[in-house]
Amino acid sequence: MQGSPATNTDEHAAPGVRRPSRMHHHAFVTTDLEVTRHFYEDLIGLPLVATWAEVDRFPDRDRVYCHTFFELADGSALAFFQFQDPAAEPPVARQTSPSIHIALDCDEATQQDILDRLRGAGYSETDAVMRDHGYCKSLYVNDPNGLRLEFTVDVPDMPEILQQQKASAHQTLARWLAGDHTSNNSYRPEHH
């Protein structure tokens, strides 16, 4: 949720507490870096910007691996390890909940380009799913490792929506935890 850049002066940020500025990278394990590279670079459009062939001791044994980085527009990256010994680290679980995912911000044209490349590569409407959440429109797809990705386009008035959400976030959470599970998303198409 981009809306506006976070600062340490936000009313909900603890005074004087410095926050990280952005994600550097989010790393996962794969058993096939070439299939993973093809998906992220050729279909999604994230360039491979670094590949580290490594041998290191962590925590108590030598590990031989390759670590790749696929760059997003803000300079952050999605990263993938492949280990010489596949038993050294488990890959991404293929049976994870669809609620466990990485959401990437993009504009409509980029989202459509990604969808077009996926369709061109044979991804069906059930493999690459569009969903209108009201405050954003999302494209969901699993990568070849089973990792769920979301490509999100915020609505134009997202900064105002986020201001409203910031003002009520703690109250809504307390209400929900107390058992009142009434939806507060009046932006969904089914509410209009």
Predicted segments, located by residue:
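Histidine-centered active-site/metal-ligand motif
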Residues: 24-25, 67, 78, 101, ...
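Core segments of cupin and vicinal oxygen chelate
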Residues: 29-77
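Residue-level structural signal for beta-strand termini and adjacent loop
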Residues: 54, 83, 152-154
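Short glycine-/small-residue motifs
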Residues: 77-80, 150-151
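A short, polar/proline- and glycine-enriched secondary-structure boundary/capping micro-motif
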Residues: 89-93, 160-163
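Short, well-ordered beta-strand micro-motif
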Residues: 69-71, 82, 140-142
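A short, acidic/glycine-rich surface segment
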Residues: 10-12, 55-58, 86-91
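Vicinal oxygen chelate
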Residues: 5-8, 14, 21, 33-34, ...
